[in-house]
């Protein structure tokens, strides 16, 4: 992947890219490098930097100054031509040239006339690399001629006639500005009826009697000479026919009045311009002004349109009551026919103005300075346009190229000069002249052939801070000839950056479009050309963006209540945000009801005008966020007006007896509102240091109206007073007048002075600076003094600005210093401060503790001892000793897991310490290190020790499996921490009867290598509690307990336990011995009697020839664990010895709540007992046994055993 390079807007046309492109990016418009000192020795042809305008009109009453400034290396010399010939300034004593400049000063104020120096001037700036020339500067003195004397006859008109009052000002230079006023210098009012034309004449569409006056005066203002000329006043009288007296009516005819227009209503006609058509020519870029003024009665209205087009919306303006159409910045596209239409109630008239837009020359591509290295190619382009098209001509060093010295590296092709294989002799200044009949353009562009090794102009070690996920731009402004190539590297040994995440701009800037945290680091810019190499390092830090944690929310509150807006932000810890609250995008009202703390804006006693949008803006030096919320104020629920209230604020505050350090304040109390004033609180504002912040000054009794206040120097005091009664405190009074006390020397020094090094070779002196109030005068500074405590050195002092830290470099490591910080200002010093002691920077300790030894206290506790290190080797404040200890692992275990080290730190100079929590029967290793404020020193040699045996932990698990009628099997896992060699296991158990009483305890010792044991000869259906623990030679460990129940007899085994209890799960239950219950004995007797009756009935039916050989079939399907009942005596069969100890199926365990898995017996009583449909045929034989039915739902058991069903009991006999 290659580093992306941003494309240039316009590629170069020939050869390698010349240096002028990057020079334009790093050099100002005048080609001055960003760092002039860096390029002081760079040879450069002249460049005109300042000159007078082409048409230079001067004030003939002042000295003539014709500017010509230029720069170059070496500095250029200057010469002038006047009217095309050399102007020898040495021959004219009135003409001087400013030193180091080409500016001419012609002293006509002492003698001489400005008209003598009219002419066309041109300046030439020349050095060894070429010559630059200025524009042709036409110098003309301004003129403001007087009006010619004339006699103006009074004008008499009938009402309604039109009128034009001519101005015809004298021709001046520049043209005068015309306006009409009366003899009181008040401008004459203008309207759609009366207005001034572009030529200065005053036009009346129709006259009215109120136009009668004798002082219509035209004024011409000549701005250049700041003079005003005036025409003779014109008298106008407007009369109506009704006003004519008999004499006038008899002696004058209608045509003898001024003008022949009728005073009756008439359609419009144009006063200007004349005729139906006219032509207007204007230059490109100027303001096109078209005018149409009409007369008529009633007054006509003017409209404007453009034929075959529309008027440009953003450039069209109407002036003079729409009588003038103006189009700014006209171009050739504005040419065409424009029509003005004058209309009144009697008709309309129109006039067409044909507009042609011509153009003086203007640049398409102006030539730019060209910097090349020897052997390179380059191009100068000079392209201009105009109407008519301008002619392009070239000059070199002010001489037309046709007659200039020939240069083999130069080839001219119209508006382009091409250079190939340039040499230092090719350096010159070229002038391009583009001209037509309307004007000319002249541009200087130099060709400078240089051979310079690369130089980087960006400051070294510049730090850039950027918010994450935003672009980062790292500058590398460079210079060199030939143009250097630029490469960027990250880190001190990184490779060149060639990844897509970077963009390299032509000016050397490295852009990271989306900077991330891992973009942080040092970047190196390297510039190379064939003459050498230069590099520069910059640093980039990526900061977390500022974001809201809590934003203000919409609120609706009642008038008079309080509302709070919360605004919390999370920001980068290195940036300090400022929170600004705004109301309706403006500042908060200057009202104490608005209070702002760190995260909240609180508005108390809300008023209707408080409604609006409140914005919280959080700003850091790198980013900002804002959030807004709307507050709506509603009417409150009516409440009774209070009888009592806080006092009204005091007023009429006055300062008297004004001294340097005291003043007397007097005031007039406000109304106490039916509750006596108990005290007055006086606050002050320091407008100089803490404007807008009011602080407590004093309190006086409620009966006083004056207070003598102590003042501090150099404080601009304002005071205000609040009154307080039992209801509360009044609002503050209006502020008093300000009183500025005189400055004095500080009367206190900074506090919290400390000296603490941050590096081994420095001492950082910090203090809490004085605030502005404490400064006592302007120019607050601090005198910082220090010297070694144990040396004979003199105090070293430095005066620093109003800061809070000073760093002393080059100090020895951890040496005590005496430090003083004294305040001073422009008036003097504060009292001599007391010295405090500090230390230069710490370094890591040099020596490890020696003679480390360990004594074992018991199996879990040991004590370590060591010898202290020499104090000088600590190289800092001794914070203590740190012990690292860990349990040694075998090589196989070390490979499987990381060794966990434990750390204990013993403060101060202790040389021993206890190591608790050790594991018995283990091998441990430890080492000791000394600790200071910088960190840890080297570790001592590892020391090993063994802990003796201890008692083991409890067995990891204990399970009761395979319960039978008289046995239980225990399985367990050894202790997780044997803490020695296990010698045996101890098992204790005891039965629990139905009343939860414990029976006799049985002890049993089991060999240590066993993990399974079977207990025999237990009571059936009995709960047992087990206690189990391991032993070492030291003693017994913690025990684990469990409970389990042996199984019940076969009748009870057949499904009386709840189905949700898994086999073999040992659990506690509340067991009731039902065998001793009276109801159970009675039930058993009833069941026995019922069984006997059924046996007799069955026997009789069998003797009569029953349908099925029941006995044989039932014997074939009988449960293998149950013996059939004897036929001869009718009693139940007993369990055999073999079956008493017959193990359960593999993996089965009988739970303590006596649930038996259904697959253990197909003849489960639950299938046929009470609550289940009977499964017998008409002769009582068991049908289910032959139907193959296996899946029966087990019944839920309870805490007492159920009596067996007589039907199921019958199944066991046959």
Swiss-Prot record:
It is found in: Cell membrane; Cell projection, Axon; Secreted. Keywords: Cell adhesion, Cell membrane, Cell projection, Disulfide bond, Glycoprotein, Immunoglobulin domain, Membrane, Phosphoprotein, Repeat, Secreted, Signal, Transmembrane, Transmembrane helix. One of its GO terms (biological process) is homophilic cell adhesion via plasma membrane adhesion molecules. Residues 1109-1129, 1151-1160 have a biased composition (Basic and acidic residues). It is a single-pass type I membrane protein. Residues 1109-1214 are annotated as: Disordered. Glycans are attached at residues 83, 223, 245, 251, 276, 314, 377, 433, 507, 619, 716, 802, 858, 993, 1009, 1019. Pfam families: Bravo_FIGEY, fn3, I-set, Ig_3. The modification Phosphothreonine is found at residue 1131. GO terms for molecular function: ankyrin binding; cell-cell adhesion mediator activity; protein binding involved in heterotypic cell-cell adhesion. Belongs to the immunoglobulin superfamily. L1/neurofascin/NgCAM family. Constituent of a NFASC/NRCAM/ankyrin-G complex. Detected in a complex with CNTN1 and PTPRB. Interacts with MYOC. Interacts with GLDN. This is Neuronal cell adhesion molecule. It comes from Rattus norvegicus (Rat).
């Amino acid at each position: 992947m290659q580093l992306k390079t941003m494309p240039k807007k316009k590629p170069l046309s020939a050869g390698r890219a010349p240096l002028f492109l990057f020079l334009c990016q790093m050099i100002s418009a005048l080609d001055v490098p960003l760092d002039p000192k860096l390029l002081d020795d760079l040879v450069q042809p002249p460049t005109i930097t300042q000159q007078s305008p082409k048409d230079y009109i001067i004030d003939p009453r002042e000295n003539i100054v014709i500017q010509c400034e230029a720069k170059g290396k070496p500095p250029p010399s200057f010469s002038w031509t006047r009217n095309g010939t050399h102007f020898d300034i040495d021959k004219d004593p009135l003409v001087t040239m400013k030193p180091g400049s080409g500016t001419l000063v012609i002293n006509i104020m002492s003698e001489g006339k400005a008209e003598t120096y009219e002419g066309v001037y041109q300046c030439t700036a020349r050095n060894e690399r070429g010559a630059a020339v200025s524009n042709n500067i036409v110098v003309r003195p301004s003129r403001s001629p007087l009006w010619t004397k004339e006699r103006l006859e009074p004008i008499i008109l009938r009402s309604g006639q039109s009128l034009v009052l001519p101005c015809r000002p004298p021709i001046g230079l520049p043209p005068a500005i015309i306006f009409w006023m009366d003899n009181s210098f008040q401008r004459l009012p203008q309207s759609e009826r009366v207005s001034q034309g572009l030529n200065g004449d005053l036009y009346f569409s129709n006259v009215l009697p109120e136009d009668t006056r004798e002082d219509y005066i035209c004024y011409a203002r000549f701005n250049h000479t700041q003079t005003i000329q005036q025409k003779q006043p014109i008298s106008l009288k407007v009369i109506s026919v009704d006003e004519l007296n008999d004499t006038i009516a008899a002696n004058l005819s209608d045509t003898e009045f001024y003008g022949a227009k009728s005073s009756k209503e008439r359609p419009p006609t144009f006063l200007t311009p004349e005729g139906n058509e006219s032509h207007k020519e204007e230059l490109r870029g100027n303001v096109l002004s078209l005018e149409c003024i009409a007369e008529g009665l009633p007054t006509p209205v003017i409209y404007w349109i453009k034929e075959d087009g529309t008027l440009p919306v953003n450039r069209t303006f109407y002036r003079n009551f729409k009588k003038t159409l103006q189009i700014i910045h006209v171009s050739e596209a504005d040419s065409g026919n424009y029509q003005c239409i004058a209309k009144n109630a009697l008709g309309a008239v129109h006039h067409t103005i044909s507009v042609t837009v011509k153009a003086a020359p203007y640049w398409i591509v102006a030539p730019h300075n060209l910097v090349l290295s020897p052997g390179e190619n380059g191009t100068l382009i000079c392209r201009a346009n105009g109407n008519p098209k301008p002619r392009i001509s070239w000059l070199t060093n002010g001489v037309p190229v046709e007659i200039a010295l020939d240069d083999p590296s130069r080839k001219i092709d119209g508006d382009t000069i091409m250079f190939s294989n340039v040499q230092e002799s090719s350096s010159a200044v070229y002038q391009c002249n583009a001209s037509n009949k309307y004007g000319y353009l002249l541009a200087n562009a130099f060709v400078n052939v240089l051979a310079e090794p690369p130089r980087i102009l960006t400051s070294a070690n510049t730090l850039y801070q950027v918010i994450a996920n935003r672009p980062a731009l790292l500058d590398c402004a460079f210079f060199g000839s030939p143009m250097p190539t630029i490469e960027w590297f990250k880190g001190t040994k990184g490779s060149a950056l060639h990844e897509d995440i970077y963009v390299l701009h032509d000016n050397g800037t490295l852009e990271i479009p989306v900077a991330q945290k891992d973009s942080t680091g040092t970047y190196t810019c390297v510039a190379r050309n064939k003459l050498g190499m230069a590099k520069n390092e910059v640093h980039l830090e990526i900061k977390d963006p500022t974001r809201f944690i809590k934003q203000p929310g919409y609120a609706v509150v009642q008038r008079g209540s309080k509302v709070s807006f919360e605004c919390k932000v999370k920001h980068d810890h290195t940036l300090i945000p400022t929170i600004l609250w705004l109301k309706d995008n403006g500042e908060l009202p200057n009202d104490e009801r608005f209070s702002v703390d760190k995260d909240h804006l609180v508005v108390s006693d809300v008023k209707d005008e408080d409604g609006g949008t409140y914005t919280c803006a959080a700003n850091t030096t790198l980013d900002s966020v804002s959030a807004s919320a709307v507050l709506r104020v509603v009417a409150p629920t009516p409440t009774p007006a209070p009888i009592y209230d806080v006092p009204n604020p005091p007023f009429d505050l006055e300062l008297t007896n004004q001294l340097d350090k005291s003043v007397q304040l007097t005031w007039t109390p406000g109304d106490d509102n039916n509750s006596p004033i108990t005290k007055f609180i006086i606050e002050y504002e320091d407008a100089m240091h803490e404007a807008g912040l009011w602080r407590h000054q004093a309190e006086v009794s409620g009966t006083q109206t004056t207070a003598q206040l102590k003042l501090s120097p150099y404080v601009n005091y304002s005071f205000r007073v609040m009154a307080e009664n039992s209801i509360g405190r009044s609002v503050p009074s209006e502020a008093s007048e300000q009183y500025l006390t005189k400055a004095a020397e500080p009367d206190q020094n900074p506090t919290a002075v400390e000296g603490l090094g941050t590096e081994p070779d420095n001492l950082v002196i910090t203090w809490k600076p004085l605030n502005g109030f404490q400064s006592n005068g302007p120019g607050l500074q601090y005198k910082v003094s220090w010297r070694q405590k144990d040396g004979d050195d003199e105090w070293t002092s430095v005066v620093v600005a109003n800061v809070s830290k000073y760093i002393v470099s080059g100090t020895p490591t951890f040496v005590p210093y005496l430090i003083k910080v004294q305040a001073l200002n422009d008036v003097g010093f504060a009292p001599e401060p007391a010295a405090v002691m500090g230390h230069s920077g710490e370094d890591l300790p040099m020596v490890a503790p020696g003679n480390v030894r360990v004594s074992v206290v018991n199996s879990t506790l040991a004590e370590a001892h060591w010898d202290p290190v020499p104090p000088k080797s600590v190289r800092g404040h001794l914070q203590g000793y740190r012990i690292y200890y860990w349990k040694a692992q075998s090589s196989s275990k070390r490979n499987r897991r990381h060794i966990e080290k434990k750390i204990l730190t013993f403060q101060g100079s202790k040389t021993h310490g206890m190591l608790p929590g050790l594991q018995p029967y283990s091998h441990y290793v430890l080492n000791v290190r000394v600790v200071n404020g910088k960190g840890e020193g080297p570790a001592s040699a590892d020391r090993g020790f063994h802990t003796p045996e201890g008692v083991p932990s409890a067995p990891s698990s204990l399970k009761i499996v395979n319960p039978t009628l008289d046995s239980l099997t225990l399985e367990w896992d050894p202790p997780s921490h044997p803490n020695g060699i296990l010698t045996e296991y101890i098992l204790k158990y005891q039965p629990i009867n139905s009343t939860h009483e414990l029976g006799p305890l049985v002890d049993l010792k089991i060999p240590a290598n066993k993990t399974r044991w079977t207990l025999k000869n237990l009571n059936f259906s009995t709960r047992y509690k087990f206690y189990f623990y391991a032993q070492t030679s030291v003693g017994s460990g913690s025990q684990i307990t469990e409970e389990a129940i042996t199984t019940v007899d076969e009748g009870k085994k057949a499904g009386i336990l709840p189905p949700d209890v898994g086999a073999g799960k040992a659990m506690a239950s509340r067991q009731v011995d039902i065998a001793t219950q009276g109801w159970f004995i009675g039930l058993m007797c009833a069941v026995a009697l019922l069984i006997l009756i059924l046996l007799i009935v069955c026997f009789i039916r069998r003797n009569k020839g029953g349908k099925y050989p029941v006995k044989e079939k039932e014997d074939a399907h009988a449960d293998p664990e149950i013996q059939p009942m004897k036929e001869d005596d009718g009693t139940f069969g007993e369990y055999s010895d073999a079956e008493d100890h017959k193990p359960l199926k593999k993996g089965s365990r009988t739970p303590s709540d006596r649930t038996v898995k259904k697959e253990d017996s197909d003849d489960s009583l639950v299938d046929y007992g009470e609550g289940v449909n009977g499964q017998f045929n008409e002769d009582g034989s068991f049908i289910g046994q032959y139907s193959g039915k296996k899946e029966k739902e087990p019944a839920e058991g309870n805490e007492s055993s159920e009596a067996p069903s007589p039907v199921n009991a019958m199944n066991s006999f046959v």
